[in-house]
């Protein structure tokens, strides 16, 4: 595309050079700039990428978007604007032909449940035989092809490229987890959402947002981003079991569907039957009552599957078809995932990393604990520590608790476990500053009939260590290796 055409609707501050040149790509990552690229520099929290402008010119970039003139050598056009990342969104959506307009785009926000709901929607679409994409904590996936990602919500250019890739590979729908960080930082500017889903709001990320009010406001941006053009068929799906839904309803101009278990809603789960193999409930809806079976465990997963079903139904799929598919869905990776049912213990991993999430996790597991409940949790470094003692208190609903760090980064692991221990309500706990050793200890003390829950990480494949270095780590693999060593079994014996 000609750069003149690309910048046509942007009121730039100053252009040094010519825009009468062809460009093929846009990037905010200096390492990926190449011949014909537009490079957008920005000043981040830790790095100002303006300092890489000479590098990108040497790599062949034809245009750089900056917030002040750069002293660099080479044949390059400089476009000076006050807000480079805002311009990056405009450029990316224009260059890639507004890809979110070309498929059904569903956004899921909330403190807990984002990954489960978004994954369930993706799996429902695949079960219906439709092309689908997922983007979130577990990576980026088009149909069954998956790649890992660094952030729940990628920066704006990378996000737009992923939506474009989904369109090019014939996805009919793309479901993405929408983080409060991504909303606050403007990473989703220009994304045309068709359905916005809210799961819940509990304390988290106050190290970034400062207050619960600011955190809640960030979540609400997804619903205001639906826009005001009422000629379009757009929907909000809100959890009536969370009081924050009332506020979100007030800022949403489109039709709203509410769901709930404990509070009256348009869509409700009734006559719930639970086991470690899944749940069965009557789904009471405005269009009839359906008998729903799912492989997911726990009351909170009933809320999650209702939200997913409503979202898919709202865009035209019959509820009968959705109910049929839901019965055979795969587990959501790292979300109340039972590892190897042949073991004499119930070994479970989960991503719960807030007090509310852990409460719901323990509520889900406790009815099926045959002997002891051994519960391992971690606290992340460089995060809001005000929530930590409450997490420790909730963990002590278990019979035995193991406190560990979780991505300690530059914080002292012993300090993190001590903060968790401040909330302990009994003395049946131990602290490990090495998470892997804590997991091995959990298995070592477990006896047949016990339930071991490894919480906080799910299948996250690394630990963030000092210097923000990512060291390979998998709770599930460490736990299984220790369990097979103690109890026997494993892949070689199956």
Curated annotation (Swiss-Prot):
Its EC number is 6.3.2.7. GO terms for molecular function: ATP binding; magnesium ion binding; UDP-N-acetylmuramoyl-L-alanyl-D-glutamate-L-lysine ligase activity. It catalyses: UDP-N-acetyl-alpha-D-muramoyl-L-alanyl-D-glutamate + L-lysine + ATP = UDP-N-acetyl-alpha-D-muramoyl-L-alanyl-gamma-D-glutamyl-L-lysine + ADP + phosphate + H(+). Keywords: ATP-binding, Cell cycle, Cell division, Cell shape, Cell wall biogenesis/degradation, Cytoplasm, Ligase, Nucleotide-binding, Peptidoglycan synthesis. ATP binds at residues 110-116. It is found in: Cytoplasm. GO terms for cellular component: cytoplasm. GO terms for biological process: cell division; cell wall organization; peptidoglycan biosynthetic process; regulation of cell shape. Pfam families: Mur_ligase, Mur_ligase_C, Mur_ligase_M. InterPro entries: Mur-like_cat_sf, Mur_ligase_C, Mur_ligase_C_dom_sf, Mur_ligase_cen, Mur_ligase_N, MurE/MurF_N, UDP-N-AcMur-Glu-dNH2Pim_ligase. Transmembrane segments: none annotated. Coiled coil: none annotated. Carboxylation is probably crucial for Mg(2+) binding and, consequently, for the gamma-phosphate positioning of ATP. Belongs to the MurCDEF family. MurE subfamily. HAMAP family: MurE (MF_00208). This is UDP-N-acetylmuramoyl-L-alanyl-D-glutamate--L-lysine ligase. The lineage of its organism: Bacteria, Bacillati, Bacillota, Bacilli, Bacillales.
């Amino acid at each position: 595309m000609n750069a003149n055409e690309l910048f046509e609707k942007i009121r730039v501050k100053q252009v040094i050079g010519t825009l009468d040149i062809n460009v093929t790509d846009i990037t905010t990552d200096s390492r990926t700039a190449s011949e014909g690229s537009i490079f957008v520099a920005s000043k981040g929290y830790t790095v100002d990428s303006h300092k890489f402008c000479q590098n990108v010119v040497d790599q062949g970039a034809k245009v750089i978007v900056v917030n002040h003139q750069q002293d660099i050598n080479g044949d390059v056009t400089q476009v000076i604007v006050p807000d480079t990342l805002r311009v990056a969104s405009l450029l990316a959506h224009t260059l890639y032909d507004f890809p979110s307009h070309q498929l059904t785009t569903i956004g899921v926000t909330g403190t807990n449940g984002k990954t489960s709901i978004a994954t369930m929607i993706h799996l429902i679409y695949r079960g219906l035989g439709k092309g689908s994409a997922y983007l979130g904590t577990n990576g980026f996936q088009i149909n069954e092809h998956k790649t890992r990602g660094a952030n729940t919500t990628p920066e704006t250019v990378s996000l737009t490229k992923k939506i474009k890739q989904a369109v090019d590979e014939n996805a009919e729908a793309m479901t993405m987890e929408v983080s409060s960080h991504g909303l606050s930082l403007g990473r989703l500017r220009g994304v045309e959402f068709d359905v916005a889903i809210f799961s819940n709001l509990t304390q988290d990320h106050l190290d970034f947002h400062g207050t619960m009010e600011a955190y809640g406001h960030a979540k609400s941006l997804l619903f205001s981003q639906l826009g005001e053009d009422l000629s379009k068929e757009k929907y909000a799906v809100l959890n009536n079991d969370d009081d924050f839904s009332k506020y979100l309803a007030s800022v949403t101009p489109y039709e709203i569907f509410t769901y709930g278990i404990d509070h009256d809603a348009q869509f409700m789960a009734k006559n719930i039957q639970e086991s470690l193999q899944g749940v069965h409930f009557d789904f009471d809806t405005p269009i009839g009552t359906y008998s729903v079976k799912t492989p997911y465990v726990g009351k909170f997963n009933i809320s999650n599957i209702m939200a997913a079903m409503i979202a898919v139904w709202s865009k035209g799929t019959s509820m009968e078809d959705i109910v049929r598919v839901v019965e055979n869905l795969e587990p959501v990776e790292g979300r109340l995932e039972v590892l190897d049912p042949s073991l004499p213990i119930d070994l479970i991993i989960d991503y719960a990393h807030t007090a509310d999430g852990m409460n719901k996790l323990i509520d889900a597991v406790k009815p099926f604990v045959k002997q002891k409940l051994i519960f391992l949790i971690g606290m992340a470094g460089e995060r809001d520590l005000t929530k930590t003692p409450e997490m420790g208190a909730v963990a002590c609903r278990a019979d035995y608790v193991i406190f560990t760090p979780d991505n300690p980064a530059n914080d002292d692991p012993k300090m993190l476990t001590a903060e968790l221990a401040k909330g302990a309500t009994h003395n049946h706990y131990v602290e490990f500053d090495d998470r892997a050793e804590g997991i091995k200890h959990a298995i070592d003390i477990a006896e047949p009939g016990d339930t071991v829950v490894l919480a906080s990480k799910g299948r996250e494949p690394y630990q963030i260590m000092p210097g923000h270095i990512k060291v390979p780590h998998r709770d599930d693999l460490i736990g299984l290796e220790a369990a097979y060593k103690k109890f026997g079994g494993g892949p070689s014996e199956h």
